Amino acid sequence: MIDSLENEIPHIKFKDVSFSYLGEKENLIFKCNFSIKKPGFWMIVGKNGSGKSTLLKLINGIIKPKNGVIDSNANIGMVFQNPDHQILMPNCRSELLININQNISQNLINKKIEYVLDKVEMTGFEKRPVYTLSGGQKQRLTIACALISNRNFILLDEPTAVSYTHLTLPTICSV
């Protein structure tokens, strides 16, 4: 009974996970073990080049471990370090639309778009072409996309790298 209940609660678990990039002899990540047993506010802290981004890609399934087991039933959203690596659509609204459940009314879709744009201080940017956005605005748009997607885990890779620190922590904490 407890095992079946644990499988219903979103979780992420690493058991002896190791990873190295192709051509590298040493593992960037070696026998990593941890578990996140429920959604919440979690941070991975480390020096540049220590494998934080790689760890997030492993969690999200973008890359596979060399050894070990990753057990996850989480519905994961990701905000990459460089927003240009994930923005696909020509304007803010269309980018948000590809991240939202389309099985809801148009009225509710509009309200959700308005809500998340307000959360990231981009009210009125709905029709704005993505190519006109600054780096910080693009990063905020990717955070809005993660928020609107209703994922139970959102992974943010260097969310404060684009100099809008005043916004990021309150936005992330309010989710």
What are the residue ranges of the model-derived segments?
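A short, flexible loop at the N-terminus of ABC-type nucleotide-binding domains that lies
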Residues: I2-F14, S18-K31
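The feature captures the beta-strand-to-loop junction immediately N-terminal to the Walker
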Residues: V45-K47
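Helix-to-loop junction immediately C-terminal to a conserved catalytic motif
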Residues: N60
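Conserved ABC ATPase "signature" region
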Residues: N107-F125
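Conserved ABC ATPase signature
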Residues: P129-L133, Q137
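ABC ATPase C-loop
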Residues: A146-L147
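Catalytic Walker B motif of ABC-type/P-loop ATPase nucleotide-binding domains
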Residues: I154-E158
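Single conserved hydrophobic/aromatic residue that forms the stacking wall/gate
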Residues: H166-V175
